[in-house]
Amino acid sequence: MNYIDLHVHSTASDGSFSPSEVVELAKNAGLSTFALTDHDTIDGVAEAITHAQQIGGIEVIPGTELSCYYGNREIHIVGLFVDYQDAVFRKTLDDLKQAREERNEHMVAKFVAAGIPLTIEELKHGNPNSVITRAHFARVLVEKGVCKDKNEAFDRYLGIGCPYYLPKPKVTPEQILPLIQQAGGTAILAHPYSYKMSRSEVEHLLDDTLIPLGLAGMECYYSTYDNGQTQELRSIAYARNLLVSGGSDFHGIVKPDISIGTGRGNLRIPDKLLNDILAYRSHTA
């Protein structure tokens, strides 16, 4: 059996390895396929696909992880097999990136005004095209000795309700799901139990909002889920004829306990899930 990972990040957003390095890591981990799903960008996809073709033995699925709001909760939708060369799709993602950058500049100003010097250059850390997230702020706060680790950074400075937190401009599922579909992608709800929602709340999210908008699947395999959670999510998905997906959410140094393909050591995602996604795409094309 071959194994896959359909949720992976690189330096194109808040990962710590370049797209080419991620390809090498995926191949060395024995994966047959992985999806590069950086936050609100597809900027690393071309590099990853090119490098995979050069070294052979590994396939790259073009993807992205898009943030949106369900009420006051931020949720993430992974788009798999998006057309990363589509001009309209790229323009929309560039607009989302610009909105993030404006938010980041305001957050930097809040830190500086409080006597904690941060710069955008420090956040980008030699990757000028990266999409900056709060994880970048956490890294710099730890490097400067302001916080002992990223958990403290989020608890004291960056979490919702903390003094330096600023929300991103609110994008809705009604905007994100059609965007993925228009780019030829397959929309997957990422890590549904990471939003502090009960099973019934997840089911309402699916039934009332996401499925009517064209959601195709849900991540049921994930680095922090035990077998019971995975099976529960699989049952929710199958009851609604949703695809079952899975991914490690690998970031590298940012999440040092999570390895590509295996998560915290007990994650194995069979390629049958990818075959099911491909079959779905062939029937809906």
Regions found by a protein language model. Give the residues of each.
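An N-terminally biased module of ancient metal coordination in phosphate/nucleic-acid-related enzymes
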Residues: 1-73, 158-159, 171-255
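Conserved, well-ordered active-site substructure
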Residues: 258-270
